[in-house]
Swiss-Prot record:
It holds the Pfam family VirionAssem_T7. The gene is 7.3. GO terms for cellular component: virus tail. It is found in: Virion. It comes from Enterobacteria phage T3. The keyword Zinc does not apply. Its main location: virion. Keywords: Viral release from host cell, Viral tail assembly, Viral tail protein, Virion. This is Protein 7.3. InterPro entries: Phage_T7-like_viron_assmbl.
């Protein structure tokens, strides 16, 4: 057990012991004040309110989305190879050339 953990436990124990009498005194004072103000017996009155009527939202409109045809000259093989190449690039794509001269490290 670390040194600070021991200190923390000791402080918690002392605070807990000091707090117990304060809680009891607070409860007793609260009861006395409540009785003096006529709050000895509390009555809870619940009124039932009618549930608010919520109108149903209008249905969503149907939107016609034109289908996009494949661009001319582009087939799946090219796009698949481009994806593989980009994935294989990895960290290489994040590096900055030394001759760029920007002076900003990424």
């Amino acid at each position: 057990m670390g040194f600070f953990k021991k200190i923390k436990k000791a402080v918690k124990k002392v605070v807990k012991e000091v707090g117990k009498p304060i809680e009891k005194a607070g409860k007793e004072v609260g009861k006395a004040v409540g009785g003096a103000l006529g709050a000895g017996k509390q009555e809870i009155i619940q009124q039932e309110a009618p549930a608010p009527v919520v109108a149903a939202p209008p249905p969503a409109q149907v939107v016609d989305v034109p289908e996009q045809d494949k661009a001319e000259g582009e087939d799946e093989a090219q796009t698949e190879s481009a994806r593989k190449k980009a994935r294989a690039g990895g960290k290489k794509a994040l590096s900055v050339a030394r001759s760029s001269g920007g002076g900003i490290n990424i």
